[in-house]
Amino acid sequence: MKTTPRILEVRTRILKKNDEIARGMRRDFEQFGLLVVNMVSSPGTGKTAFLKETLTRLAACGEPSAAVVGDLETDNDARRLAESGVPVRQINTHGLCHLEAEMVAEHLAGWNLAGLRYLFIENVGNLVCPTSWDLGESLRVALLSVTEGEDKPLKYPGLFNTADLAVI
């Protein structure tokens, strides 16, 4: 008698712990009335310049804002954003290509989130890895520059399918 092989699919969410932390953060953010924006783009697209201008304008309008910056190494971008006058914290991933909810949660410790209206997360410059990691954000924004080519949404559907907004 010939038997047909059976395939048993077991799907375990690899990112389960991250998702649990992100859900808790999202609940906290919502309780505080805090809008959290996760900015995702390629390296060199202009995330930092775009965010610095945004933070500067929000500060000028009296809107309490802050930023968390993810980068492999250095605090260059965090120092640039701090020029806007808002609180900024740096997360160095030391080679990791994305931020994780736990990293963000640790770097938010001690901040009066209830006193903020906007929190921006400048994710590590990468169009692939950050897509899978929920950071508890209200909005995910994909930022791309014209010089990167018009086919980015086709090459990186994961990001553009999960983004709430794309800025060119």
Region annotations inferred by a language model:
Residues 39:
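Hydrophobic anchor at the beta1->P-loop junction of P-loop NTPases
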Residues 66, 141-143, 160-168:
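Conserved beta-strand/loop subsegment of P-loop NTPase cores
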Residues 156:
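Acidic, amphipathic alpha-helical patches
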Residues 47:
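Conserved lysine of the Walker
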Residues 50:
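Hydrophobic positions on the alpha1 helix immediately C-terminal to the Walker A/P-loop
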